[in-house]
Every structure is written in C-alpha cells, then in structure tokens.
Amino acid sequence: MHKKVLLAILDGYGISNAIYGNAVQNANTPMLDELINSYPCVLLDASGEAVGLPMGQIGNSEVGHLNIGAGRVVYTGLSLINQHIKDRSFFANKAFLKTIEHVEKNHSKIHLIGLFSNGGVHSHNEHLLALIELFSKHAKVVLHLFGDGRDVAPCSLKQDLEKLMIFLKNYPNVVIGTIGGRYYGMDRDQRWDREMIAYKALLGVSKNKFNDPIGYIETQYQNQITDEFIYPAINANLNSDQFALNNNDGVIFFNFRPDRARQMSHLIFNSNYYNYQPELKRKENLFFVTMMNYEGIVPSEFAFPPQTIKNSLGEVIANNNLKQLRIAETEKYAHVTFFFDGGFEVNLSNETKTLIPSLKVATYDLAPEMSCKAITDALLEKLNNFDFTVLNFANPDMVGHTGNYQACIKALEALDVQIKRIVDFCKANQITMFLTADHGNAEVMIDNNNNPVTKHTINPVPFVCTDKNVNFNQTGILANIAPTILEYLNLSKPKEMTAKSLLKNNN
C-alpha cells in the first residue's frame, strides 16, 4: 500500500519559550503538545531572508504558503519592489510611465490607493513615498489610505500620518483624499456592505469628513476605534472633483499582496453594481495599475508581472497521477490554492478543492472556534480518497489578529480537539500527517507593557511528522517542506526545487 500524506498548516502558530502572553504555551492543548514533544519535530524559520523577505521582516500567510508549496525560497512583493526602488528601476517602470502618459493626455488625476503601513505584509510605506516622488512631478496626486492595526500596532496610524504630512510639505500637489480602516477597504470574505462604504468614499460620499487627518484619527482613538476599524472619511477641504475617483483618472493600487486588494479592485474596475445602483457606475477610461497580479482582476497593467513557479509541490503530485485535496475556510482558501500553487489560480489533474464558509462575525474573537469543526467534518469524509491533502486552520492567525488573548486561548483549545480527531483518523487509516505553520502570531499576544499584540512574529514554526520512524535534520526553513514530503512519498524532486529534504541522511 502506497503512502498517503496530509499536510496540516496551522496558520499563525509560532513557537516561543516565553510564557507571558503566549496563547500557544498557555492553552490547554494536549494533542498539539504531544505532537510537538513526542513525535519527530523540527523548528523552521518562517520569516526574513528564509522566506525571501528582507532581514528581520515578519513572515505572512502569502509568503509562507508560497514557500511551502514551491520548495524553494520565493522572492516576491516586498523584497522585489524594494530592490527596484534601490536600483531606481522603479522610477522607469513601464506601467507607471504609461499612467503618467494617460493622465497628462487627459488632464486628470492619479489616485494612490492601499494599506498605509510599515508592516510589509500587504504593502509598505516606502513604496508609497516612492510613488509620490515619481508621480507628483507630472500630475495631481490623491492618496486614499487604509489604516492597518493588524500587521503593526493597533494605533500606529497617527504617528505614520504625522511623518507623511511632513514629507508632503515638499509635494504641494499631493493631497489626502480619504482615510479609513482596512476592515472596510480590504475585506476578502465577500462582505460587500463593508467594502461599499470604503468604495463610496473614493467616489466622494461618506457621512464622516475631516479637515485635519491627524485630528480625525485622534477623535477615532478617543472613541476606542483603532486603525483597522476607522470609519472611512473624506477630506472636507476639497470638493469631490479635487479628490474623488472620476473618468479618465489613473489609479495605482499599491498593495503588493493580492488577497485583500481584489474586492476593492473589482469595485473600481470591474463592478456591475451600477446595474442597480447608478451612482456606483464604473468610471470610464480609467488607467488602472496593480502592483502585482491580483488574480481575477484584469487591470490596464501590472507594475510587476507575476513570476512563474514551475514544478510546485501540487504540480509534481499531479504529474505523478496522484489525487490531491485542498481544504480551508474562506479566510485562508486562497492560501492553500492560489498561493500554494505559486501565485496562480490553476486546476491540476486529479485535484479537488473544498471551501468551507467562514463565519459571518465582525471579528473572530467573537467566534474563536471559527470553522475548524466544519473543516474537520468535511476533511474526514474525504481524506481516504486522496494521496495528498493540504489543510489550513485559520484560528491561531485570525483570532490572534484581534489581540484578544483569552479568545486566542479558546481558539487553540477548540483547534486541539479537531487535531485529535484528525490524528486518530490518520492512525486508523495509515495516513501520515505532517503538521506545520506558515508564520507566528498566537504565541505573542501581549507585550512587555501589557498591551495587546495583533501582528505576526519572527518566531520559528514547528514541522511535525506522525510517522515515528522519521528522523529530521535539526533546522530548516519553510521551503524544505515540499522536498521532504516528496522524498517521503518516494517521488523525485524536480530541479526547480532548490531546497533540500529534511529527512536525515538524504538530500
């Protein structure tokens, strides 16, 4: 009987020896504890240069799944754009130059839309500053900024805005048109009611207005509203023609990570909402540029076209005529499909994709169990039918992002119950489970000043195998996972997979 493998990815489950504020250490999780302490386990580096990011940069779900699936270190987004800025090729980018040509021809504006954050997960402020430097020489530039509060401290927007306002003193033709939290402008779970509020602000319509952007943020803070949840507001000092999206304008969506940029991009460029809401009619003759490939969105140009990841783990499995399953809830479905397959939406032979709906709650600390039981129920019905399965549990990451320590404890304890069900099933059916994570989060929920922490970490993640005959090398990175699984399955590793297997005495 040939081997069957389940790769379970616990999103945001990092390892730290610290006790205080560490939901991973302090939750009652007997099954996970047993796996890490009593089965073959190695810690993997999931941040910085180990995953193709700048040194010291926190890992994230997109990069984590890319590296796991690719079997090589993948340089994307942040590192790629940083290098283009450093060597100045950024300022000669064809997509940007075409945008300038378009707005000069049409005497129109350029809108820079995206997450205003130094987190480096979806975007980076240095990229925005470079765009301002480039475009302000040629046209009026309008900024539409989404507050973060998840990948950085919950109330860091004010400080970043203060720095931006100083920077903008040298660029008088650049204005801040709108400000709002990513909760509204960067949804990825089809919550169109939220996204529509942010979109209408881009069109010049909002119940909230500001004369001073920093003053508006301060008022939000006074009302206990952190950066992520700031209600979209428009600049009261400008008429709508001066800042709102209009016909013939140029648009740059400067997020390099696609998953939370797709819905807003759809509203701007592809929306058919105007069929029953005429005021939302898509603007004509927009020149719309996305920093990277936003799957499902066809812009005028990509600033940085997608690189091809040839012979990913899923592709190798398919080429060997093996059946594979991908399963996750909505929040992480793109990660076990699009990102795991190298940043492309592909349909492989003998592949089944199963999407479990995420719960419709405002924030996941209100339902910390999320959809882990429903995922497990569906998984155990199907698992025996597949040679290779990729599973993602979102709880540690999504509840970790709320900064609610007690909710994260509950999330991990609910998850542990489902992990035990899976382990028991795998043992009974001769299926080997490899368990890992894409980055850390839940292991640092409170800082030394007793403040909640909502962002990812640079801590390592576990890589566990339920086959006790396995011996791992002592250290590794996420890219080692795919070669390890291929060797375990007795499948040849393609030359494109430059990382090595972690199985001892083998390459």
UniProtKB/Swiss-Prot annotation:
UniProt-listed NCBIfam families: pgm_bpd_ind
UniProt xrefs under Pfam families: iPGM_N (PF06415), Metalloenzyme (PF01676)
Catalytic residues identified in the record: 61
Protein name: 2,3-bisphosphoglycerate-independent phosphoglycerate mutase
Keywords linked to the UniProt accession: Glycolysis, Isomerase, Manganese, Metal-binding
UniProt xrefs under InterPro entries: Alkaline_phosphatase_core_sf (IPR017850), BPG-indep_PGM_N (IPR011258), Metalloenzyme (IPR006124), PGAM_B_sf (IPR036646), Pgm_bpd_ind (IPR005995)
Family label: Belongs to the BPG-independent phosphoglycerate mutase family.
Entry note: cofactor: Binds 2 manganese ions per subunit.
Enzyme Commission (EC) number: 5.4.2.12
Signal peptide range in chain numbering: none
Domain of life: Bacteria
GO biological process: carbohydrate metabolic process; glucose catabolic process; glycolytic process
Enzyme class: isomerase
Subunit structure: Monomer.
Species whose genome carries this gene: Mycoplasma genitalium (strain ATCC 33530 / DSM 19775 / NCTC 10195 / G37)
Gene name as annotated: gpmI
Residues reported in the UniProt entry to bind Mn(2+) 2: 11, 61, 438-439
